[in-house]
C-alpha cells in the first residue's frame, strides 16, 4: 500500500512531483490561482481543487499520511490558515515548505502550538540549487512535523550534480 499525501497550495506541481517520485499517492491537491492550476494540470495529469487555505473545510480534506503545505509564496496569514486546518484534523505528518524569512517568524509564534498538538518537529534550511538542477539562490525552510519520533524523517538531499 502506498503512502498518501494531500498537497496545499500546489503551485505548478513541484511538491506533487517530489512526492510522486518518492512513491506517494496524491489524494488531493488545492491551489487558489486558476492560472497556476492550468500549468499544474499540464505538468501533472491530475485535477486540482481551486480554493485558498482560508476557504477549505477541514472535514472535506481526505485522510492521508502526510499533509504538505507549500508556503513559499505566502504571507503570515497563510501560515495561520494552515495551522487552523492542522488543529482541526491533526494529520499524522505535516510538511511545511516556506521561505527562510517566514520560518523565523513561524518558530517564534507557532512551534509551541504544534508541540501542544503532539508533534515532534525538525527542520532544515536548504538552498534551491542543492535539490534542483537550477542555479537558484533562494533558501527555503523544510519543516517536518510528525506525531511520532521525528528523528527517522529524511530531509531532501542533493540529487543533481554539476
Give the positions of each predicted feature.
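S-adenosyl-L-methionine
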Residues: 37-61
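Class I SAM-dependent methyltransferase "Motif I" SAM/SAH-binding loop
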Residues: 8-12
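Extreme N-terminal starter segment of soluble prokaryotic enzymes
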Residues: 1-5
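Gly/Ala-rich phosphate-binding loop of Rossmann-like dinucleotide-binding domains
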Residues: 20
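Class I S-adenosyl-L-methionine
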Residues: 56-64, 71-162
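Short beta-strand element of Class I
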Residues: 25-27
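Conserved acidic E/D residue at the C-terminus of a beta-strand in Rossmann-like folds
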Residues: 30-34, 97-98
